[in-house]
């Protein structure tokens, strides 16, 4: 799955409008309770139905129990059975302009990297006190069988690295996708790699 000029996002969706588009603007991600910067000892509790994935790429986050890990180049994916839901993570050096510029460049390239790209928007926000950007869009999917998809993608810089977490799902499952996305982002921690 690809996205943006640096391929930050997790896959395309159909040009048809979503069946159940979010009814509100993207919310700002909630920072965790007040505390110091994440460390290797920082832990987050996975909600019921989730497990904490301590990834060898240097992070941990909560993923649904039945999601399996797959490395694809510079990205790590946690995939649902049948790959209906794709939770992706990319860790990279910071890029010029920070998260908002990265997501804006990716959104500008959306039509060339995500077939049928539409309804893309980038919102500046914060994540755990760090400047961040949320990119949300719909697209056709990579194949007719895959069908229309919707993607939520949050990018931020922390500790000299750029982190990108996204969830891509069928447009008819945006509510479930948003839950997976929110849990992943809210439980994400940098760990010793």
Where does each model-flagged region fall?
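Hydrophobic single-pass membrane-targeting/anchoring helices
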Residues: 1-38
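Solvent-exposed, non-transmembrane segments of extracytoplasmic/periplasmic domains
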Residues: 24-193
């Amino acid at each position: 799955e690809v996205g943006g000029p640096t391929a930050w996002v997790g896959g395309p969706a159909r040009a048809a409008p979503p069946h159940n588009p979010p009814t509100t603007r993207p919310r700002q991600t909630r920072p965790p309770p007040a505390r110091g910067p994440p460390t290797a000892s920082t832990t987050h509790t996975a909600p019921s139905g989730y497990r904490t994935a301590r990834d060898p790429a240097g992070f941990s986050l909560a993923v649904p129990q039945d999601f399996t890990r797959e490395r694809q180049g510079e990205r790590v994916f946690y995939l649902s059975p049948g790959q209906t839901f794709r939770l992706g993570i990319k860790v990279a050096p910071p890029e010029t302009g920070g998260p908002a510029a990265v997501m804006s460049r990716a959104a500008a390239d959306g039509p060339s990297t995500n077939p049928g790209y539409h309804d893309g928007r980038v919102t500046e926000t914060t994540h755990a006190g760090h400047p961040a950007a949320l990119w949300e869009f719909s697209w056709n999917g990579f194949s007719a069988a895959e069908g229309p998809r919707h993607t939520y993608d949050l990018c931020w810089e922390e500790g000299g690295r750029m982190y990108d977490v996204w969830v891509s799902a069928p447009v008819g499952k945006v509510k479930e996708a948003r839950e997976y996305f929110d849990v992943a982002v809210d439980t994400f921690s940098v760990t010793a790699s």
